[in-house]
Every structure is written in structure tokens, then in C-alpha cells.
Amino acid sequence: VPSFFPDGFGTYPVIAAKVNNVSQGLKYRAFNSRQVEFLDYTSYVGRSVYCSSLCFLLCKAAKDLFPECRIVLRRPISKGYFCSLDKGDGTQIAQADIDAISARMREIVDEDMLFRRHEVRTEEAIEMFRELGYADKVSLLETSGDVYVNYYTLDGTPDYYYEALVPSTGCLKVWSLGLYREGMLLRVPNRHKPEELAPFVEQPKTFEVFSENLKWNSIMGLDNVGDVNKACRRGEASDLIKIAEALQEKKIVQIAEEIDCRVRAENPVKIVLITGPSSSGKSTFCKRLSIQLKACGLKPISFSTDDY
């Protein structure tokens, strides 16, 4: 490929490609005319490919050191990914464990191991992951509806990822792993400066919201997408929506009550700001909050600042 691009692809190394607008690994084989766009880390898809590959690297290193462990990539937070690790021996994760996992990850990066892509019948993949004890992947694949599925192996360790991965571990040079709360935080590169780590940003409220969400998902038996798919197949979609709406309404009531207390305080609150990206539900939330504030005896005036 470099012979077709003697001047290079850009400032940063290419790690994936879009083929007819679908992300593919660099080992994807095209047998006829295709529209190809090469991607580096600064692109949204390129960053996603890098981070997925990095997560696989972390899982591989943890399994090498703690064969009975269960590692769960919980949520993106603080410019990284929060992960929980159950070592299988009943002990809490410690800094020594983090150091050992980091060292093993560096060894794998230095060895430049290949991420190998495999295509098999979905039934074969389900049976393989069931034997490995990956219940979440089994649940997801059982409800995918696909006849064939792609999975990846790293030095013989299999895992399932929906999107493409980088060609080899040698591409994953920038990252950091540290102890964070009751788990660990996998930090990733800055999207605009891939040679540097993204700056750490403490997000305690976001972390609390994610933790509460996981708690409620567990209570409802929805630990992964496969569980949601199965619930929908059982005709429970309407109930799930109603429960989610009830939980949100409960939160809005709590917010309204807190605002009411602050309005009646010695230094009263006079304005409440609601922020969020386009089409995220700000106006709807504003109307629902206004109703609850009126129920508290207040007379809120709502208006949109982006309605020019």
C-alpha cells in the first residue's frame, strides 16, 4: 500500500480504514473496486479502533497473570476507561497488581503480537465462549441473529469485538494504567495529540451516575446488551421503558426538591441552567422539571437560550 502513497498518509500512523464507509482492519481484503479512507487516531473511528484494541490488550495481560480473574470494562470516565477486576481469590486489587498488569502489557506491546481475525459460524463462537465462561458474550451472540460472526485472538486468547482492531500490539504504545476507586483506570491518548495521554479529569458526579445505573441494570437483570435483547424477545420492552421512565421521574422529583430548598434558603437560587448537546432532551427535561417545581409551590419561568 505505501507504494501508492509515496508521500505518506499524514502526520500519524494509519491504524484502520473505512471501506465503503464501514470500518475495517488493515488486513481486510478487497476483491473489487472499493472506496477506501485510511484512518489514524485523530479520527473518531480510528480512536475507537485503538481503544478497543487497548482493552483487548488489558484483558490479555490480566488473564496471563490471573487465569481465574474476571475483568469488566465498565464505562468511559475521566478521559479513560474504568475497569473492575475480580482476581478470583477473594482479595482486592492493589497497586502491586496494577504494576504487574502494566508490565505484562508492555511486554506484549514490545513483542508486537498480531491481532488475528477469525470468521466462524455463530454457533461455534457461542460454544467456544461458553466453555471459556464468557456469559455476556454468549448472551450477546445468541441474540445477534447473524449466521456468521467475527472474533479476534491475541496469542491464542480469543475475544469478541464488533469493530476492527489494529494490526498488532506494537501500535499500542501510548496508554497508562492506574488504581482508581475500587478498580483501575485505563487512560488513552489525546485524540488531537496521540503521542500524549489525554489529561485526567476527575468526574465524581458522572462516576456516581454510572455506578447507580449499573446497580439498577443489575436489579432488573440487564447486565449487557444480550440481556436487553432477550427481555425484548419475551415481550418485556414496554415494562423496561416504563421502569426507566419511573426512575427518571424519581430523579427529577429529587432535583426539584433540592432546588426548592435552595430557593427558600438565606441566599436563594434564582436561575437553573440545563446544558447538553443538540437533541439530547433538554427542552423535554426542562418541561418535566418545571412541572415538579410547580408541585413544590414554585412558579418557574422556562425559556430556551438557543432559540434565537
Residue locations for each model-derived region?
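Short acidic beta-strand-loop surface patches of small beta-rich interaction domains
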Residues: 12-28
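Active/ligand-binding-proximal structured segments within catalytic/core domains
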Residues: 2-6, 47-65
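P-loop (Walker A) phosphate-binding loop of NTP-binding proteins
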Residues: 277
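Hydrophobic positions on the alpha1 helix immediately C-terminal to the Walker A/P-loop
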Residues: 284-285, 289
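Short beta-strand-centered segment that lines the nucleotide-binding/catalytic pocket of NTP-utilizing
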Residues: 295-308
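Conserved glycine(s) of the Walker
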Residues: 281
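Hydrophobic anchor at the beta1->P-loop junction of P-loop NTPases
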Residues: 272-274
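Auxiliary tRNA-acceptor-end handling modules of aminoacyl-tRNA synthetases
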Residues: 13, 28-47, 61, 70-255, ...
